[in-house]
Amino acid sequence: MGYTVKTVAERTNLSPNTLRYYEKEGLLPSIKRTKSGIRHYSDEDLEWLGLICCLKNTGMSIKQIRDFVDLSLQGSATLKARCEMLVDHKRSVEKHIEQMNLHLEKVTHKIEFFTKQYEDFTS
């Protein structure tokens, strides 16, 4: 089944311009077009787009995602390299989560501090 840019944009909450940009950057290399040039996305393209969004939303750069896509296009010979790339990215995400948890603890502590200050002030 084929999906138009508009349909994919609605399903993914990405703008049509973002979808075109991802294609231009080589992140979606298998998008088919009609004879008149209209893009048609397949279910497999939507799966790829889901992975691309996941990687981007967790801090992977467009260049790194393109490198991952390029490796994927080379087939099974690059499975190990792709796995290593994702393991490295996972470590980076975990480190970021640790840092964010430290910030969250500090904010929580300040909320508790100011709540107590306010309660003492108003009683």
Regions found by a protein language model. Name each.
Residues 26:
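Glycine-centered, phosphate/nucleic-acid-interacting loop/turn motifs that mediate DNA/RNA or nucleotide
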Residues 1, 15, 58:
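Flexible coil/turn residues that form the inter-helical turn or adjacent wing/linker of helix-turn-helix
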Residues 22, 41:
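Conserved active-site tyrosine of GNAT-family acetyltransferases
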Residues 8, 15-18, 35:
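Short glycine/proline-centered loop/turn elements that form peptide/ligand docking sites
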Residues 37-39:
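Short, basic, alpha-helical segments at the C-terminal edge of helix-turn-helix-like DNA-binding modules
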Residues 4-10, 29-32, 43-123:
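Arg/Lys-rich, alpha-helical DNA-contact motif
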